[in-house]
């Protein structure tokens, strides 16, 4: 982080602004790494079940094929001048049709972005075309924001469906 802060300060950023920018870059890199880990863990499942997987970074590319364009159009949410896509998308294809099965919202820090996942489900419920899509939030809960009085004996899976 210190070298990034120095780089930003060389660009005439204040120390405070440079620190914020460096931290944001670090947090973004950690988040993307977590998404990649989830994708690797799901790869075999997808192959065995004839499920395809993509992510927001791929869908934001300038040139995507027709299949990915259909996935993108099915999920793109607009906020004024901004457009938002979910982190990871699981889908199947059948001839010219694309069926979105699930979106995975991957959050390294539960605290800062926990409202995004339920928001996705609410948006998807507004249309009969997307209301079937499952929505899952995946987090390592590094900040221990999701806690239990007695630790559960089995791993938990939360679904917003």
Spans of model-derived segments:
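Interdomain/boundary linker segments immediately adjacent to catalytic/signaling cores
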Residues: 1-54
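Phosphate/oxyanion-binding active-site loops and adjacent basic polyanion-contact surfaces
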Residues: 30-35, 81, 110-113
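Domain-level recognition of nuclease-like catalytic cores that cleave nucleotide substrates
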Residues: 126, 140-161
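Active-site metal-binding core of divalent-cation-utilizing nuclease and nuclease-like domains
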Residues: 56-94
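Short acidic, S/G/P-rich loop/turn micro-motifs used as interaction or catalytic elements
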Residues: 107-113, 142-145
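Conserved catalytic cores of phosphodiester-cleaving nucleases, focusing on short active-site segments
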Residues: 88-90, 101-108, 117
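Short, charged, amphipathic alpha-helix that recurs within catalytic cores of restriction-modification
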Residues: 114-129
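Hydrophobic beta-strand segments of well-ordered beta-sheets in folded domains
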Residues: 102-103, 131-139, 161
